[in-house]
């Protein structure tokens, strides 16, 4: 995909994008992983309205795996699942987990607390 984009996008645009990307990442230089992801969560760094975990956690992007996981659970007799990092549990909440004990964990304490409040009955 990247190679295809490089063929069509002018080099100066790619250079500008890279410069912008590096400047955004520079704010995390030298920080602990927990601090980086806490900042990303608190500032909603990914800018996705559907999931604070980013574009890769939307229902559209995860539809295929969400549809197939229940079959995997059943086929392999899976009784428990540990999901690290679980992020905001946005798409995983929609996966049928009949008979599977789900445990999610994340490095962002505020996110874990929020998930525990939102999903305490699940």
List the predicted regions and their residue ranges.
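Conserved N-terminal segment of class I S-adenosyl-L-methionine
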Residues: 2-122
